[in-house]
Amino acid sequence: FTSADVERLFSLYPIKNSIVSTVANIDAAVVNALNRLSQHFILFDYLTPLPIANCYETPETLGQDRIASAVGAATLCPDKNLLIVDAGSAITYDFVSAEQGYLGGNIAPGIKMRLTVLHQMTKKLPQVEVEQNALTPLFGKNTKEAIAAGVVRGGGFEVKGYMRALSEQGIDFVAFATGGHAPYILNGVKDGMRHEPNLVLIGLNKILEYNMHGA
């Protein structure tokens, strides 16, 4: 992505404001182009003011996508307790309190990572690919099926475990699933989760609006 791409986007669409969030190093020319062409521009980092409280002890180490998805969920369901499950390279579990804001979360290996590690860290288990919408049996009848079922169903059971733990504490909450591998999770959970593929983008837009209006 280059400054020329920025110029082209601004020429094609009526863009007025912009926000950038990335884990990779961003070209200074891209930042300069966005800053020059935008009425309001934010290079999102841990110092950016947020519309919800962030109670994480080390905000500088918190993934920008995680806090953005938390803001996105709070935007869609204000004044609610929220569990956000983001299934990508890793699976993250984040909790937003209706009263206290973002309280933290956990990080676990993603579906693809689990499949790969089973192959790489053992001598005989094969590399297995699983379609996102594939229905896996409860118990596999061959090794490939056992790996697929163990990983995909295990991910679903993991999510259910978090949901059950919150419910057992008497916490009413709304659960969101997001991320590129969310369909794997949704297949295992079936009910009780709201699928929102654009949760991070919704959160980034809210953060941009919040800062535009004098956070």
Model-identified regions with their sequence ranges:
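Short beta-strand scaffold segments in enzyme catalytic cores
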Residues: I91-V96
